[in-house]
Amino acid sequence: MELPANVQNQLMQFQQLQQQLQMIMYQKQQFETQLKEMEKAIEEMEKSGSDEVFKMAGGILIKRNKAEVKEELSEKVETLQVRVTTFEKQEEKMQKRYTELQESLQKVMGQGQ
C-alpha cells in the first residue's frame, strides 16, 4: 500500500524531529556532566585549607590563586547553567511537537487500515 505524499512528508518530519530531539538530549547531557564536574571542583576547592590550587593547562599543572580559580569556575558554572536551561526549553518544545506529530500520524495510519 502506497502512502499518500502528505503522510510520507509527515513521516519524514517525524524522523527528522526524532533525530534532532536525540541530539538535543545528548548535548544537554554533556553540559549537565560538565556542570556537575565544575560544581564538584568548586566544592573540593572550598574544602582545601590552602590559598593556592593547581590548575591543568595544556597537559601541565600550574599553581594558581584559589580565589581566582574559584571565580573562573563560578563563571563557567553560570554559563553552563544557561546552556542547560536553553537545551531544556528546546527539548520541551521539540518533545511537544514530536508528540503532536506522533498522534497525527497514528490517527492517519489508523484511518488507512
Swiss-Prot record:
Keyword Nucleus: no
Annotated localization: Cytoplasm
GO molecular function: unfolded protein binding
Keyword Ligase: no
Record's signal peptide: none
GO cellular component: cytoplasm; prefoldin complex
BP terms from Gene Ontology: protein folding
InterPro entries associated with the record: PFD_beta-like (IPR002777), PfdB (IPR012713), Prefoldin (IPR009053)
UniProt keywords, alphabetically: Chaperone, Cytoplasm
Function: Molecular chaperone capable of stabilizing a range of proteins. Seems to fulfill an ATP-independent, HSP70-like function in archaeal de novo protein folding.
Subunit note: Heterohexamer of two alpha and four beta subunits.
Membership in a protein family: Belongs to the prefoldin subunit beta family.
Name of protein: Prefoldin subunit beta
Lineage: Archaea, Methanobacteriati, Methanobacteriota, Methanomada group, Methanococci
Gene: pfdB
